[in-house]
Amino acid sequence: MRIDLLLVLMVEALALLFAAKLARDRLLKRRGYFVNELVVGQRSLGAAISQAGYLVGILLGFLGAISFAGRATGFLAMVGHVALFGLVAIVLQLLADQLSDQLLFRGLAAPKGTVGDTNVSHAVGKAAVSIATGLVLRGSMSDPTAGVVACVAWFAVGQALMVAAVLFYCRLTPYDDLAEIKRDNLAASFPIVGILLALGLIMEAAVATKGDGTMIQTALHGGKFLGVSLVLVYVFRVIASRVLLPKVKLANAIVEQRSVAAGLQEGVSFLLVSLIVTYFLS
């Protein structure tokens, strides 16, 4: 890539991140959150983590758009494509944030009009949603044959799978995951973070390895890849947890001892296995 194009794309990336931050700040301000005051004035780690995850997710989508734009013909076409999909990424990331509050972390958001965001466990989970969504967007936006509709469709599939996977995991655990996160138990948050990031990686790989043909054939191919990957991730995750944490009762370590180390190992096991599975299946 020529140096002048590289400089233009870097400027466009910074402009996109600035626009994304402004859009999120305006939206949260309507709910009683003043992000800059929380981060700088109150030194809220939770507010900083959730904002950082959101910006990383935005940048991941931007990188996907660039990988396709590199094959575009003409300077204006490339810049326009990146700008369009950058704006799409902002809208979808903000939507994902709203959906996670309603479907994944229901009841954990501070009431409207309050100015506190100190629950780090909740913030880590929301940051994971943003990053996982960014991975899905990076995969869909890097496809030269896909448009905005296809990108939105993959986004919808990704959000549905995230909700289903987390709710399924919560049904398996002998404790109330949301109650523990509400208590700011970071140990209970990390397994959910691992699941979300693992799904983001799997979804990105599914988009990248989809078959050629009609939209129905593409959906069937992607669905088959996702199904096999999710089953293998769950099976190998059970094996990995036995290796990483032998003779340890995770529920007791997470709830009673509030062991962040145990929760982190649980979450990492999902992430490690998803990397292995997607590498060999893609």
Predicted regions and their residues:
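Alpha-helical transmembrane segments
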Residues: 1-18, 76-93, 146-162, 217-233
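Interfacial loop-to-transmembrane junctions
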Residues: 246-267
